[in-house]
Regions:
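Strand-loop microenvironment adjacent to phosphate/nucleotide-handling motifs in alpha/beta enzyme folds
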Residues: 4-173
């Protein structure tokens, strides 16, 4: 059985922005933000674990499960609040620098595709929503998986870029 859990950013996990900001604060700044308007959804580690467990229990196969994480958070506001909570004044004591969006990065997170939004509805748990993916050609999918398995490690990136036009790798593998 195959399901997909659609996550926001998991607070406190590796790669989460909070530990990065804390490290940058400890070093005297600046805090780096990719774009002044960028927003992201957040969930805690226990929420992420519950989403996986409950989605597994609710799944029939092929669904997409999404946790209601409330409103997206503006990363710039998060940086400014963290600076203030640390006893500093943003842009006076600790600067914030904008680094620019990375390849493939979006200003606004999309937890489900537009085509998946039409069918989204609550589950028995009010914080978990479920939807169905768009039509998938199973034979074509299996063919693509077999092709990827037979490729040399460096060749799969080009193939993925053909399959997913919005996929933009940020560095060479």
């Amino acid at each position: 059985m195959c399901i997909r859990d659609s996550f926001g950013n998991v607070l406190g996990s590796n790669g989460s922005v909070i530990p990065l900001f804390k490290e940058q604060l400890e070093n005297g700044g600046p805090l780096t933000v990719t774009h002044p308007d960028i927003t992201r959804y957040f969930m805690t580690i226990p929420e992420a674990a519950q989403l996986v467990v409950q989605a597994g229990g609710l799944a029939k196969g092929g669904e997409i499960f999404v946790l209601n994480m409330g409103e997206p958070v503006k990363i710039l506001s998060l940086a400014e609040k963290l600076i203030k909570l640390s006893g500093f004044e943003p842009y006076v004591d600790i600067d914030i620098q904008f680094t620019g969006l990375r390849p493939g990065e979006k200003l606004y997170e999309e937890l489900v595709l537009q085509s998946e939004k039409d069918d989204i509805h609550k589950t028995q748990n009010d914080k978990i929503y479920v939807t169905s993916p768009g039509d998938i050609d199973d034979e074509k999918l299996i063919s693509h998986i077999e092709k990827i398995r037979s490729m040399k490690p460096g060749d799969s990136r080009e193939f993925l870029m053909e399959l997913v036009p919005t996929y933009t790798p940020d560095r060479e593998a």
